[in-house]
Amino acid sequence: MEGTHYPRHFVDFTVFLCQKYGVDRNRLFVEYSSGLPPPLAGPRTGYYEGLLSYREKDGHPEFLITVFKASREPLLTLAHEFAHLVKNLKSGNFDKHLRPPDDSAEKALDEQALNDLAEFQSTE
């Protein structure tokens, strides 16, 4: 069986994000998937480079961030999906349905992701 080969700094960046935002690493699973990413919901063409999934197990929330190998910038995609997680944790809203992207919300998450990645890279 072949193991997963993560992009450089992928695991370290995940740990950094968990520490920065106080996310319990035992409740977060991160997958780097060679599977085909799903197409964008709505009329826009393209595909999701990453996804955030949620479930409850034994009364405790668990989260899965999937970053697809098709992602052009896997660390940035990881940070973007993590930004969704932080937003959901703050709001308490864990909607599981794929919807067409909200451009203004996605832009704010992209900015947070860029800032988080820059902060991480400055500590290397």
Describe the role of every protein-language-model region.
Residues 14-20, 72, 86, 124:
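Prokaryotic Sec-type signal peptides and long signal-anchor helices
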Residues 33-72, 89:
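Active-site scaffold of zinc-dependent metalloenzymes
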Residues 6-26:
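Zn2+-dependent metallopeptidase catalytic core
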Residues 72, 76, 88-122:
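Post-HEXXH active-site segment of zinc metalloproteases
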Residues 13-16, 81, 116:
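Charge-rich, solvent-exposed alpha-helical interaction surfaces
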Residues 25-35:
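Membrane-integrated ABC transporters
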Residues 1-9, 102-106:
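A short, highly charged nucleic-acid-interacting micro-segment common to nuclease
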Residues 79, 83-87:
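Short active-site segment of divalent metal-dependent hydrolases/proteases
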